[in-house]
């Protein structure tokens, strides 16, 4: 049984053409831009509210970790990018460091499906959970996460 223990994502209609145009695939598996430039220019503080493009979610997580703003709104026209960010936050909340490293450092995690069901699913929206249930091979394949997405 899957359940969501918190709401971090607003509802969207995943059947709209503006979302289906991505063919159920994210474009970016990792972020190319360096968030240090953003920090230097934006000077994000604890009382700030940040609006940013999700992309692969790496800069979003960096803003939270480095600056601890009051709130971060991550948006992306491609809902699959948000599924990836949800997966990263779920992993950081529920998995030991070694497993997080396997998933996002090495890009391969043979036990991904089991971890998704037993540890990650409570931290995912139902749409993100369904997405990753249908993409468990992302972390099992010989290529791994960093050979997936539309920008490979």
Region locations from a protein language model:
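N-terminal, positively charged/glycine-rich alpha-helical extensions of SAM-dependent methyltransferases
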Residues: 1-20
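Alpha-helix initiation/capping motif
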Residues: 8-9, 34, 56, 96, ...
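Conserved beta-strand positions in the Rossmann-like core of class I SAM-dependent methyltransferases
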Residues: 51, 73
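A short acidic (Asp/Glu
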Residues: 60-66, 83-88
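Conserved alpha-helix/loop element of class I SAM-dependent methyltransferases that forms part
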Residues: 25-49, 58-62
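Class I S-adenosyl-L-methionine-dependent methyltransferase module
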Residues: 80-152
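Short beta->alpha hinge that forms the Motif I/post-I loop of the SAM-binding pocket
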Residues: 55, 77
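Conserved S-adenosyl-L-methionine
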Residues: 65-71, 79
């Amino acid at each position: 049984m899957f359940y969501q223990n918190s709401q971090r994502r607003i509802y969207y209609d995943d059947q709209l053409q503006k979302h289906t145009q991505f063919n159920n695939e994210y474009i970016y598996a990792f972020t190319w831009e360096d968030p240090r430039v953003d920090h230097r220019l934006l000077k994000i503080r604890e009382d700030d509210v940040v609006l940013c493009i999700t992309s692969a979610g790496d800069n979003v997580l960096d803003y939270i970790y480095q600056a601890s703003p009051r709130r971060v709104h991550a948006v992306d026209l491609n809902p699959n990018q948000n599924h990836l960010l949800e997966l990263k936050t779920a992993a950081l909340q529920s998995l030991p460091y070694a497993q997080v490293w396997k998933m996002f450092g090495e890009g391969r995690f043979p036990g991904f499906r089991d971890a998704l069901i037993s540890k990650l699913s409570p931290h995912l929206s139902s749409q993100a959970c369904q997405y990753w249930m249908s993409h468990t091979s992302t972390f099992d394949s010989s290529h791994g996460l960093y050979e997936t997405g539309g920008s490979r």
